[in-house]
Amino acid sequence: MGKTYSSPINPIPKAPKGLAIHHWLNFLQAAYRLQPGPSEFDFHQLRKFLKLAIKTPVWLNPINYSVLAGLIPKNYPGRVHEIVAILIQETPAREAPPSAPLAEDPQKPPPYPEQAQEASQCLPILHPHGAPAAHRPWQMKDLQAIKQEVSSSAPGSPQFMQTIRLAVQQFDPTAKDLHDLLQYLCSSLVASLHHQQLETLIAQAETQGITGYNPLAGPLRIQANNPNQQGLRKEYQNLWLSAFSALPGNTKDPTWAAILQGPEEPFGSFVERLNVALDNGLPEGTPKDPILRSLAYSNANKECQKLLQARGQTNSPLGEMLRACQTWTPRDKNKILMVQPKKTPPPNQPCFRCGQVGHWSRDCKQPRPPPGPCPVCQDPTHWKRDCPQLKTDTRDSEDLLLDLPCEAPNVRERKNLLRGGGLASPRTILPLIPLSQQKQPTLHIQVSFSNTPPVSVQALLDTGADITVLPACLCPPDSNLQDTTVLGAGGPSTNKFKILPCPVHIHLPFRRQPVTLTACLIDINNQWTILGRDALQQCQSSLYLADQPSKVLPVLAPKLIGLEHLPPPPEVSQFPLNPERLQALTDLVSRALEAKHIEPYQGPGNNPIFPVKKPNGKWRFIHDLRATNSVTRDLASPSPGPPDLTSLPQGLPHLRTIDLTDAFFQIPLPTIFQPYFAFTLPQPNNYGPGTRYSWRVLPQGFKNSPTLFEQQLSHILTPVRKTFPNSLIIQYMDDILLASPAPGELAALTDKVTNALTKEGLPLSPEKTQATPGPIHFLGQVISQDCITYETLPSINVKSTWSLAELQSMLGELQWVSKGTPVLRSSLHQLYLALRGHRDPRDTIKLTSIQVQALRTIQKALTLNCRSRLVNQLPILALIMLRPTGTTAVLFQTKQKWPLVWLHTPHPATSLRPWGQLLANAVIILDKYSLQHYGQVCKSFHHNISNQALTYYLHTSDQSSVAILLQHSHRFHNLGAQPSGPWRSLLQMPQIFQNIDVLRPPFTISPVVINHAPCLFSDGSASKAAFIIWDRQVIHQQVLSLPSTCSAQAGELFGLLAGLQKSQPWVALNIFLDSKFLIGHLRRMALGAFPGPSTQCELHTQLLPLLQGKTVYVHHVRSHTLLQDPISRLNEATDALMLAPLLPLDPTTLHQLTHCNPYALRNHGATASEAHAIVQACHTCKVINPQGRLPQGYIRRGHAPNDIWQGDVTHLQYKRYKYCLLVWVDTYSGAVSVSCRRKETGSDCVASLLVAISILGKPQNINTDNGAAYLSQEFQQFCNSLAIKHSTHIPYNPTSSGLVERTNGILKTLISKYLLDNHHLPLETAVSKSLWTINHLNVLPSCQKTRWQLHQAQPLPPVPEDTLPPHTSPKWYYYKIPGLTNSRWSGPVQSLKEAAGAALIPVGGSYLWIPWRLLKRGICPRPESSAAVDPKTRDHQLHG
């Protein structure tokens, strides 16, 4: 079941939110009574169920556990049923509360009578995480329930996404179900936007590849509708959910001014979101508290605003506002299960609003009339909020139209802030103050005081100033200025500013009414006029920084370059350069500066630069951008790679190429990304600081530059492609090829493309333009009238000795020309084998004779390297040649001299490669390549597999490739039906028709059990292997020891091989294995497969001779099922042969492990003498053996478990650290609970008491010392909340708690023994072993029971009141009163009671506990007839 919480040092599971601590403790105590103990999964399911149950109306105080049990769904995971059943047994039944009386006011409509709920209901419980999902279509009630849950949330909000994600997890919907759900939940506009985003995400996912997706079976949406395609359906569901987060408006978080408190959001959570948003949104140095206090009231919901208004705390400190609103929680507004109200007849009286009969006034649709005339215009027909005089005059509001979008992205990294209740801020147009990037933010305003005309002045806008600042020249002469201290950027100032406590009127250009301030600061030096945040907030204005993009080139700047997440700019130092390189670099930088490719720059970031000399003697500028590339995100390229030029139809004979000059330098770079492309030009000999520059255009060396340029060039050429549909424009990077059917159309196309490129600022290079007639060199290939060849072919020297670098370089050149080289994969495979095991470039490789022959074959094939251009009217055919070394495929067309392409595919790196799977993969690869490059699929496939082998594979195989082969079976032809063509002789090569041995099945697999054959069971591990041969009885069994370097997989193979060797006399055999790997391996071998590389190649090759010609039945057996059928029992017997028997602990081993007492050893099989001898022989017990013990004394013991506890804190030194052990012991049973802490505080004491309660139960009384932690207010409040009575020991005597002190000694002794046995034992483990020994192993000699058995026993019987206490002889003591400095002894007096640490002495008419250190034994005072006192009874001191 998992890890249980029986260990006392494990933390208590945290209570669900909204559940009282005493209720949670009841559930914990019930859970700990389960047998076996509860697991983490049980607590997880209990918390999950309680979170949902809290939201239902049956959650009352006290809880009705019987009703709560009815809410648990059938087959609910975990053991929640058992926990609630225990609580039902322990809790007495309660009477139902009386119903509420009806309303007596005749003016009010009667309330809705509550209908009795027939059956308990609860909110729907979805599948837990990890439960298997079962698909079922939506029902109307399901859609209604989902819509009700998301009715108060916006699409894309966290609440909306959480509900939708759980619904998808529960129902496992198909693509059609998700479409229906979207149409039901969202508006048509949101559904349209979601559809666009979903199509974009699906296109990106299809290009990246999806597991199980077949491009030929239709779009992903069609394939996801199949309920059996669970993997594709899961991919579609994730894309469908991701489309919500990409909706416009959901990608940007709300600013701090737009964060609203949700209708069900706690006020504290709302204030926390505001605080985070202000930390991210306010400029540095801006005071946050005034804005936070203002928004905490203005953006709160109606309930919290009413509370603050009623208490007059709308502008109070934030702490008072939090305390005022802490009584309002969303529990008051939780959703409940609605009961259908009883229909009441409509009233006979007319409605006082509309005057009509038939409805109550509360249901009237007529708007409520105003209570009186409008206080503004005295019009009785409208409310004040609708008064026309309060409408904003828009005649002079040109600035309201300046809300233009900024093209530059925001620099600040935003954090995801939760929207309160899924609400969005209202769309209100605030006054905008346009600012400039080059100048300070200023505004022309007019300032006036009482009875003074307004004065025009230019003010500086400062959102960091709490209060407005005005110069002293504007202040009236008779103003009453007061001294004040101002805290600014330069520190506190006391003599520069005065405060004016009178109203100030500020007239703003975009506001008709002036802004009135109650006070402002006066600058006595007449230097500053600052419009502070008090004025800006009152006028509800918004500062707007207009973006002024610099126009560098006609080409638009890219929107995304991969650095939008704004990582820290790289700082790579510039390395030194010699004078020649430095001079060349200076010239190159000067040219780039003149061309306006770079500009001077002062800012962070640096990447090194250096020049490289070309073969013609010129220098090339290189910027090392590897550091920037490492933090740049890859962009999805619009093209999958270079095009296959054989797709250029022969019907387009007229060609022309266009070359672009410095193409990358034509795309402007946004200024926000300049730190990532900055560099430093050093001074000679470091005579001064270097000159800083940064790129203005897209530089070469940036990894996303090719992709960005392709996007820009494709945007320019798209309109031209639509204008000339009969022509082709092939674009790859900065290379462009034009193809047209006629010369006139080619000329027109060339002019159109040239004009479009020149208009966008992309310069052309006319001297590099090529045109037909004649060959065209493009992308390293030569385009002729009917064929495609490569410009250069590798020259191969047939020799036997190669260096690693030479062989790698030659194979790389062969890889480039392999699409046109007529050679099989086997020749290339031999050369790839020669590279294995070599890593040093200086290694010398000696080729074998077979590899040298492969070189000759490739050298001859290179002379025939040529490919045909596509003929649109002819179909495309494919040839597949499967070989043990790899697959060779050819695409060709009939009646053509050369094929279209040669494709070589290596086999996967697995131990067995089924040829059926390889054939299916080749079909998919060829169809995909043909569809991608030629726009059509292959008409037929010619392969080297016989029809007999293919038919047998389709009938007997259970591989997934069978469905693919059956789907394309109508296009299969073996090599007997050869296509026509001049290169037909190639198909008749002997090596193609060579028989493949692995295609012939070496043995036969029977679909059913063979009755007359014996059964073989085998298994293996890393150290042993075993097998059993059974035929009505065990015929043979054997265990094999394996080498130390053997793996578990090899051990299983060893066991099977040994069993097959013993089974040679039988022609048929039943094989039962618990290894899925071996079962699949045998089935693949029976169908035919190519062997692959494996660490157990030798073992795999031994299987074929042992199985040759046999008929076998293979069956997979699940291990460790404990079933009683013969197959499971024989498999368990095979496993048992490799395992040693599990023996119980003997008394000696038990004592070595736990150091328990002799009585515990006697309970585990040892005699009294043996137990005594074991303890005496233990070395650890001899070294650590406590001498002496404290006297028993008298303590207050409980008469039942959990009646009275004693608690104490003892200290333990462990590895240079001092730990506190918080010990709780039950005075009745002696059961102990311990918590290990680093501190001794009130919180630690509360936590330790919670741990003890969860294990031992809740006590009625606890007794501790008078330490500060136990007397803290937090601990006292916790005890009072659980109704636990707390008392302390005797004052001034910390040793008076005898039981817990003795327990401390026993605990420390055991821990010391465990640490002596193992110095590296963790302290938590030592504490757990000690508790196990004390509570469950050690036997108390007085009752012959363990402490835990005594803790579970019945309470002691009550003592009759007439029972007299035993008579004891009186004892007399001299004493000193604790706390007094008097050194004289008082007494003697007679003690009333004695305990382990003190005695109860009558002092001055009362009784005090006096510790032993302040007591001295005395004798009875001499009576009047005194006799000689016995000298033996003289005073003496006794220490307890």
From Swiss-Prot:
Q: Required co-factor?
A: Mg(2+)
GO BP field: DNA integration; DNA recombination; establishment of integrated proviral latency; proteolysis; symbiont entry into host cell; symbiont-mediated suppression of host gene expression; viral genome integration into host DNA; viral translational frameshifting
In terms of superkingdom, the source organism counts as Viruses
Q: What does the record give as the active site?
A: 462
Q: How is the cofactor bound?
A: Binds 2 magnesium ions for reverse transcriptase polymerase activity. Binds 2 magnesium ions for ribonuclease H (RNase H) activity.
Per UniProt, residues of the RNase H type-1 domain are 1010-1143
Q: Name one GO molecular function term.
A: RNA-directed DNA polymerase activity
SMART domains, per the entry: ZnF_C2HC (SM00343)
| Start and end residues of each Integrase catalytic domain | 1197-1366
- As recorded in UniProt, coiled-coil segments are none
This enzyme catalyses: Endonucleolytic cleavage to 5'-phosphomonoester; DNA(n) + a 2'-deoxyribonucleoside 5'-triphosphate = DNA(n+1) + diphosphate
Is-annotated flag, keyword Ribonucleoprotein?
no
Short motif (PPXY motif): ranges = 109-112
**What residues does the Peptidase A2 domain cover?**
457-535
One GO cellular component assignment for this chain's record is: viral nucleocapsid
DNA-binding segment(s)? 1371-1420
Motif PTAP/PSAP motif extends across 98-101
EC annotation? 3.4.23.-, 2.7.7.49, 2.7.7.7, 3.1.26.4
**Domain Reverse transcriptase intervals:** 593-783
Residues of the site described as Cleavage: 123-124, 337-338, 430-431, 553-554, 561-562, 1145-1146
Zinc finger motifs (CCHC-type), residue ranges: 349-366, 372-389
The UniProt keyword set, sorted, is: Aspartyl protease, Capsid protein, DNA integration, DNA recombination, DNA-binding, Endonuclease, Eukaryotic host gene expression shutoff by virus, Eukaryotic host translation shutoff by virus, Host gene expression shutoff by virus, Host-virus interaction, Hydrolase, Lipoprotein, Magnesium, Metal-binding, Multifunctional enzyme, Myristate, Nuclease, Nucleotidyltransferase, Protease, Repeat, RNA-directed DNA polymerase, Transferase, Viral genome integration, Viral nucleoprotein, Virion, Virus entry into host cell, Zinc, Zinc-finger
What UniProt notes about the protein's domains is: Late-budding domains (L domains) are short sequence motifs essential for viral particle release. They can occur individually or in close proximity within structural proteins. They interacts with sorting cellular proteins of the multivesicular body (MVB) pathway. Most of these proteins are class E vacuolar protein sorting factors belonging to ESCRT-I, ESCRT-II or ESCRT-III complexes. The capsid protein N-terminus seems to be involved in Gag-Gag interactions.
Query: What is the purpose of this protein?
Result: Matrix protein p19 targets Gag, Gag-Pro and Gag-Pro-Pol polyproteins to the plasma membrane via a multipartite membrane binding signal, that includes its myristoylated N-terminus. Also mediates nuclear localization of the preintegration complex. Capsid protein p24 forms the conical core of the virus that encapsulates the genomic RNA-nucleocapsid complex.
Q: How does it assemble?
A: Interacts with human TSG101. This interaction is essential for budding and release of viral particles.
User: Which named protein is this?
Assistant: Gag-Pro-Pol polyprotein
Organism annotation: Human T-cell leukemia virus 3 (strain 2026ND) (HTLV-3)
